[in-house]
Structures are given as structure tokens and as C-alpha cells.
Amino acid sequence: MPAKPAQDFFSLDANGQREALIIIKKLQCKILYSDKYYDDMFEYRHVILPKDLARLVPTSRLMSEMEWRQLGVQQSQGWVHYMIHKPEPHVLLFKRPRT
């Protein structure tokens, strides 16, 4: 029988989400934030999640701001999760327009 694929946080039932919130609270202080870097149009940053927290990230779609905040990511408003980096799913890539 094939192994059941892991579910991301947003696919879990209420009990699963409660258990996941304990993990999120425990690991939130271990989230690493890059310095910002720029091109002509955008500023960028990447966020590195602990591997146990990264298991809760959806792998087939980008997250809304509300969703990545639920996973414990803390940054100012306006950042957009813009790309999934398949080789390193624990690295979240964000951008926002330059001001």
C-alpha cells in the first residue's frame, strides 16, 4: 500500500491544524529572514523555514499573505509569495514593488 502523502497545513482537519499550530509556535523563532535585495522593479527576500515547519507548506501552489502569516512568517505588509523553488521547498521566495 503506498504511503499517504503528507498534508499541508491548509488541507488538515481541525484537529490536525491544532496539532500543527503547536509545531508552528515552537519553531517560529527559528525562521530565518534574508536581507532584502533589489532589481529595477521589485525588492525581494527569501525566508528559510525549519524543515519540520516546511512540511506544512503547500507544494503545488503559492500562498496568500494570510496563509504564510498563519505558518508563522512575520514581515511587513505587501510581500507576495511569488515562486516555489522545488529543489528547496523550505525556502519561500517573496517580492514586492519598489517604492
Swiss-Prot record:
It holds the Pfam family CKS. Forms a homohexamer that can probably bind six kinase subunits. Binds to the catalytic subunit of the cyclin dependent kinases (Cdc2) and is essential for their biological function. GO terms for biological process: cell division. Belongs to the CKS family. The keyword Membrane does not apply. It comes from Leishmania mexicana. SMART domains: CKS. InterPro entries: Cyclin-dep_kinase_reg-sub, Cyclin-dep_kinase_reg-sub_sf. It comes from the Eukaryota. One of its GO terms (molecular function) is cyclin-dependent protein serine/threonine kinase regulator activity. Keywords: Cell cycle, Cell division. This is Cyclin-dependent kinases regulatory subunit. Gene3D superfamilies: Cyclin-dependent kinase, regulatory subunit (3.30.170.10).
